[in-house]
Amino acid sequence: MNVEKIMQGLEQKHPGEVEFLQAVREVLESIKDVYNQHPEFEKAKIIERIVEPERITTFRVPWVDDKGEVQVNIGYRVQFNSAIGPYKGGLRFHPSVNLSILKFLGFEQTFKNALTTLPMGGGKGGSDFSIRGKSDNEVMKFCQSFMTELYKIIGPDMDVPAGDIGVGAREIGYLFGQYKRLTSQFHGATLTGKGIEWGGSILRPEATGYGALYFVHHMMETHGLDIKGKTVALSGFGNVAWGAAKKATELGAKVITISGPDGYIYDSEGLDDEKIEYMLELRASGNDVCQPYEEEFPGSKFFAGKKPWEQKADIYLPCATQNELNGDDADKILANKPLCVAEVSNMGCTAEAVNKFTAAHQLFAPGKAVNAGGVATSGLEMTQNSMRMSWTADEVDMRLHQIMAGIHEQCVKYGKEGDYVNYVKGANVAGFMKVAKAMLAQGIV
C-alpha cells in the first residue's frame, strides 16, 4: 500500500477536508503492514472503497424563531459504511459542523462500531444549528424541521442516529416525536439516547465516560498499574466528562480539573459527588462556561483561556472535542511523566500530539477504542427495543464492562510491539480487519 499516493488522490478529491484527511491518514499508516499481507484486499480495492462514504445527504432546514423570522440551517447525514450492520452514529448540532468533520466522525465511527463486535455500521450527521441562546420552542421547531427530511433515510434496519454535541435527551425527544408523527409508527430502535420512560437505556448518558474509565482501568492493569489513588486531569464538563468523572471517582481516582471554552478549573481537593453533579447544572445553564464552578466551590481556581494539560496529573483524559490537545500540550503532559493518556473525545489529539505520545512509548489510547462505550450502550438500547425489554443498571453496566474489556483485548492483540502496546495501531487494525472481511464477503458494492 502506498499511503502517500492514496492520500494525494484523496486530497485532490476532497480539498480542504482537514479533519477527514487526518483521520484517514492515521488509519492507513496503522494498517499498511497488515493490508500488504492480504492481496485479496488490494484486488477488491477495499481501501479505495472504505475511505468513501456510501451515501451523503445534504438538505436545508428552515424554521421560524420566536420573533417570527425565518431561519435556514444546513442538515447532513453521512452514511459511511454498512458492511456489518445499519449505519449508526450521532447527530451533532453546532456552528462548527461541516462535511469534513462529519466525514471524519463517520469514518471513525465505522471502526469504533466494529470494535464493539455489535452489528452496527458507521454514520454521522448533524447541522450548523446552535442550541445556545435558543428557547425550548425554537429548539423543538428546528428539530421537527430537521427530522422532516431526515426521516426519509433512517430506520431500525437502515440508519439509527443518536445524540452528540448539542443533541441531548431534549433534542432526541423532539426528533423522535416528529419521526413518530411522520411515520405513524413507534420504532424505538430508530433513535437511541431516548428517555428511560419511552424506550431509552439506563446508563446511556454516563456510558461514554464509564466505558472510557473501564478501558483505562484495563490499560493500567495490563501494565501493572492501579487506578486507585491516582489523579486525573480531564477536559470538558458535559455528559462525557461527567460520566468519566463519576466512574473515575468510583474507581478510587481523584479528578482535579474540568474545562470549558472559557478556560479550566483546578480543584486540588478533587471532585466529590456534589461537584460532579454540579457539572450537569453548568451544562444545563446553556452558558457553556465553567467559571461559575469557582464561585460555587471556594478553594478551586479558574484559569481563563487556558487548558488543563499544564497541570500535573497521573492520567490525562481529553473529553471535550476533536483536536483539543495539540503538540505543545503533549510536550507539557510528557514533561509531567504521566502514567496514561486516553482520548475520550473523538480524535481529541492532533496527529502531532499522537505521534509524540507513541514516539515516547507513552501509554496512550485513541478515541475510537476509549469512547466506544457510548455507541456500545446505544447498541444495547437497540437490542432492548427489539426485544421489548428493559435491563437494569447492573445488567447494562456488566455488558458495557464486558464490551470494553473485549475492545482492550483486541487492541493488545493487534498493537503489541515488544513490551509496548501501540493502542492506536491495535484499534485501527482490529476495526479495519472486521469491516474489510465483511466488505470482501459481500462483493463489489
Model-derived regions, located:
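Glycine/serine-rich phosphate-binding loop and adjoining beta1-alpha1 elements at the start
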Residues: H94, N113-K228
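Adenosine-phosphate binding glycine-rich loop
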Residues: N2-A23, M219, L334-V445
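Conserved active-site and cofactor/substrate-binding residues in soluble primary-metabolism enzymes
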Residues: M1, P15, E19-Q22, E26, ...
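Glycine-rich phosphate/diphosphate-binding loop of Rossmann-like nucleotide-binding domains
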Residues: G195, G200-K312
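Phosphate-interaction motifs
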Residues: F59-M120, K124, D128
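Rossmann-like adenosine-cofactor binding region
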Residues: G263-F364, A369
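Structured beta-strand/loop patches that form or line metal/cofactor-binding pockets in enzymes
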Residues: E40-E69
